[in-house]
Amino acid sequence: MVVTVYLLIVYDVGVERVNRVKSYLRTELHWVQNSVFEGEVTESQFRRIETNLERIIDRERDSVIIYSFRSERAMNRNVLGLEKSPLDVIL
Amino acid sequence: MVVTVYLLIVYDVGVERVNRVKSYLRTELHWVQNSVFEGEVTESQFRRIETNLERIIDRERDSVIIYSFRSERAMNRNVLGLEKSPLDVIL
């Protein structure tokens, strides 16, 4: 059985790097909202995402937080206002 | 024993409402990064936060996602680059 984890990534990066971070993360995870991505990944995918993000960001100026959970069931999601990217449409 | 939940709030709101959302959430939770707040709250605090956010945002244009977890232990946090607001300094 492949072990997976559920990721929630938020980032606050320089405007000159935002597009690169966003287009890269779109290849790995689901865009949820401005600067927020989610998705289920394998351990090796998780490490690859970390390595690739480290290459894109400027460690002195940018901030990326990767929250990881044993599964999506660990979280409840309550949306106020617009649901910019309904996850159930994608999954 | 008071039941608490751990919240992670991300928001994507119109520029004319960002300051109001941010200054309100600063009264309830810890600012973690641009448009990201965290904190442990009681069930009644959780409902108050939802009610107050509903009053501030424009439901047609803005998006707020409230992730809730049974406790902070449900999540692992991995920061790449700058830790804009070291949570351990605040807690």
Curated annotation (Swiss-Prot), chains A, B:
Keywords associated with the record: Antiviral defense, Endonuclease, Hydrolase, Magnesium, Metal-binding, Nuclease
Enzyme Commission code: 3.1.-.-
Pfam family, one: CRISPR_Cas2
Entry annotated with the keyword Nuclease: yes
Keyword Transferase: no
Binding site for Mg(2+): 12
CDD domains: Cas2_I_II_III
Cofactor requirement: Mg(2+)
Gene Ontology molecular function: metal ion binding; RNA endonuclease activity
InterPro entries on file: CRISPR_associated_Cas2 (IPR021127), Virulence_VapD/CRISPR_Cas2 (IPR019199)
Gene Ontology terms describing biological process: defense response to virus; maintenance of CRISPR repeat elements
Role this protein plays: CRISPR (clustered regularly interspaced short palindromic repeat), is an adaptive immune system that provides protection against mobile genetic elements (viruses, transposable elements and conjugative plasmids). CRISPR clusters contain sequences complementary to antecedent mobile elements and target invading nucleic acids. CRISPR clusters are transcribed and processed into CRISPR RNA (crRNA). Involved in the integration of spacer DNA into the CRISPR cassette. Functions as a ssRNA-specific endoribonuclease.
NCBIfam families recorded: cas2 (TIGR01573)
Subunit structure: Homodimer, forms a heterotetramer with a Cas1 homodimer.
Family of the protein in this entry: Belongs to the CRISPR-associated endoribonuclease Cas2 protein family.
UniProt name for this protein: CRISPR-associated endoribonuclease Cas2
